A protein has these predicted regions:
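Glycine/charged-rich beta-loop-alpha catalytic/anionic-binding loops adjacent to active sites
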Residues: 113-123, 152-154
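Eukaryotic N-terminal low-complexity, Ser/Thr- and Lys/Arg-rich leader segments
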Residues: 1-5
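Mid-domain Rossmann-like dinucleotide-binding core that forms the NAD(H)/NADP(H) cofactor-binding site
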Residues: 129-204
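Glycine-rich beta-strand-centered segment in the early N-terminal region that forms part
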Residues: 28-45, 55-98
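C-terminal boundary of histidine-terminating zinc-finger modules
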Residues: 124-128
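A structural motif shared across PLP-dependent enzymes of the aminotransferase-like
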Residues: 98-111
């Protein structure tokens, strides 16, 4: 008999108030192949894309959908071609939308999109980083072409929604790697967090909207 695991998923795209919009289920545990890592999930985070995918339509389905991108956990087993990690390694990552999500006890992920969990972060803290950090990184350094070596040091960068997940990471990347002067906006309840991210030797500010 194959081992099983607990997961959270849905069969139908129902309003979140519906009792079957998200279900606790017992499913077969996955088996690693190729360069897969089988990760015992210790923490996950929820992103806006999770709500969008769960609300993708009204059609009933017979296939279980497991949500979740971000995860942090411990490698339990590896596929035969895996070479970057070994059982016992602590890792974090944003998974793939081509595979079941991370809202489960055991999750398969290609080792090439996985990183070692920072030793100074808890599993919960590490799980909060991947998707927001990737989004902020790609926006600044790949789309906008901001230098990671400080070639644009001292220039001003406006970040809207500076207290949010992506915004708070974007501020820190802009300051640490880009050495930019950051101007960020935030709603009044979030202004304290935003100010803590923008504070530095520069005369930076956080506008309150």
């Amino acid at each position: 008999m194959r081992p099983t695991m607990k997961a959270v998923g849905h069969y139908q795209y129902l309003p979140i108030e519906h009792p079957e919009s998200l279900l606790d289920v017992q499913v077969d545990a996955p088996q690693p192949e190729g360069r897969d890592l089988l990760v015992e999930v210790k923490a996950i985070s929820v992103n806006p894309v999770d709500t969008k995918r769960r609300a993708a339509g009204n059609r009933p389905d017979t296939e279980l959908k497991i949500l979740g991108w971000d995860a942090a956990g411990i490698v339990q087993a590896t596929g035969p071609e895996a070479e970057l990690f070994k059982p016992g390694d602590k890792v974090y990552y944003a998974g793939s939308n081509q595979r079941p999500g991370t809202n489960c006890q055991l999750h398969l992920v290609d080792e090439r999109i996985v990183g070692p969990k920072p030793a100074n972060l808890s599993f919960a803290e590490a799980a909060a980083l991947p998707l927001t950090t990737l989004t902020a990184w790609e926006a600044q350094f790949e789309r906008m072409g901001i230098s990671k070596s400080g070639a644009h040091a001292g220039r001003r960068l406006l970040i809207l929604g500076g207290a949010g997940g992506v915004g708070s990471i974007a501020i820190q990347l802009a300051k640490k790697l880009g050495r930019l002067a950051v101007i960020a906006s935030a709603s009044r309840p979030d202004s304290i967090a935003c100010r803590s991210h923008t504070r530095s030797a520069w005369s930076e500010m956080c506008s309150i909207s």
